[in-house]
């Protein structure tokens, strides 16, 4: 991929109030193609694509290694100050690990030199314990070389997710407040229940396995139309834009942790 990394998907408005920069990490296919369809979100929006794509790219250190490398990339465009991080599918998990690493290193430099994570945006990023092997069907129009790279990335990403154990947070801290954007339909297109059970009703919907995690960090579950693989398609992107913007604004304002 010839795009810069990170790639500025949408610039902040030249006039008026600007929100904290949003950095979206690639999905399991390793690309940021889906994010390129997003509209203006009132802030700089960056995308990070896989720095080790294709058959020769291997992440021996798993998601933790990926998060550390991408954090260094983020600091080349947003060296300090408030920031929102997140991503679709694998990207949400990597952003979660990235935030944990930042919490672990907090205090190693002055506050003026640190990034401040206002929150995370997970776009249908399931807890690894609920991961499914169902694959994305790629369109015939994709060039063979790109198809091969994406398929390799997807295979490796599935293994990375299987191997990732969601860690405990450093003592005295907890995960940043998180907005969970959840697909309304399962992978076969069947509508999912808005509320899975009484215990999840306080979060306005299913949390895709995160309710069992030791930290209560998901502040809101936002329904977005489509399946896991179709939420960025033309018929759904307009609604996703609106809900992603609203999620960013919620994190800009600050939510109770």
Swiss-Prot record:
Known function: Thioesterase; part of the gene cluster that mediates the biosynthesis of the antifungal antibiotic FR901469, an inhibitor of beta-1,3-glucansynthase, exerting antifungal activity against the pathogenes Candida albicans and Aspergillus fumigatus. FR901469 is a cyclic depsipeptide containing 12 amino acid residues and a fatty acid chain. The NRPS frbI contains 12 modules responsible for the formation of the depsipeptide backbone which is denoted as Acyl-Thr-Ala-Tyr-Val-4OHPro-Thr-Thr-3OHPro-threo3OHGln-Gly-Thr-Orn-OH (C71H116N14O23).
SUPFAM superfamilies: alpha/beta-Hydrolases
The UniProt record lists the keyword Nucleotidyltransferase: no
Protein's gene: frbE
Applications reported: FR901469 inhibits the activity of 1,3-beta-glucan synthase from Candida albicans and Aspergillus fumigatus. With minimal inhibitory concentrations (MICs) against Candida albicans and Aspergillus fumigatus of 0.63 ug/ml and 0.16 ug/ml, repectively, FR901469 displays greater inhibitory activity than other 1,3-beta-glucan synthase inhibitors such as, WF11899A, echinocandin B, aculeacin A, and papulacandin B.
One GO biological process term: biosynthetic process
Family: Belongs to the AMT4 thioesterase family.
The name this protein goes by in its record: Thioesterase frbE
Catalytic activity, EC: 3.1.-.-
Keywords: Hydrolase
Signal recorded as keyword: no
Pathway info: Antifungal biosynthesis
GO molecular function: hydrolase activity
Organism: Dothideomycetidae sp. (strain 11243)
Enzyme class: hydrolase
Superkingdom as given in the UniProt entry: Eukaryota
Pfam families documented for this protein: Thioesterase (PF00975)
């Amino acid at each position: 991929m010839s795009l810069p990394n990170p790639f500025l998907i949408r610039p902040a408005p030249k006039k008026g109030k600007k929100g904290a920069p949003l950095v979206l990490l690639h999905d399991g296919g390793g690309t940021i193609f889906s994010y390129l369809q997003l509209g203006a979100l009132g802030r700089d929006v960056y995308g990070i694509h896989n720095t080790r794509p294709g058959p020769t790219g291997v992440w021996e250190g798993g998601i933790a290694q990926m998060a550390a490398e991408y954090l260094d990339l983020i600091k080349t465009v947003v060296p300090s100050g408030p920031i929102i991080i997140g991503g679709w599918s694998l990207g949400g998990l990597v952003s979660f690990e990235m935030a944990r690493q930042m919490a672990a290193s907090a205090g190693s430099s002055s506050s003026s030199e640190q990034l401040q994570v206002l929150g995370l945006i997970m776009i249908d990023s399931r807890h690894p314990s609920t991961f499914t092997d169902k694959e994305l069907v790629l369109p015939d129009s994709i060039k063979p070389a790109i198809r091969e790279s994406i398929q390799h990335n997807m295979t490796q990403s599935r293994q990375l997710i299987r191997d990732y154990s969601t860690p405990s947070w450093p003592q005295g801290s907890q995960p940043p407040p998180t907005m969970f954007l959840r697909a309304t339909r399962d992978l076969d297109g069947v509508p999912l229940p808005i509320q899975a059970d009484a215990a999840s009703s306080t979060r306005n919907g299913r949390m895709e396995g995160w309710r069992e995690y030791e930290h209560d960090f998901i502040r809101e579950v936002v329904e977005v139309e489509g399946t896991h693989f179709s939420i960025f398609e033309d018929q759904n992107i307009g609604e996703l834009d609106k809900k992603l913007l609203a999620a960013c604004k919620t994190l800009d304002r600050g939510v109770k942790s």
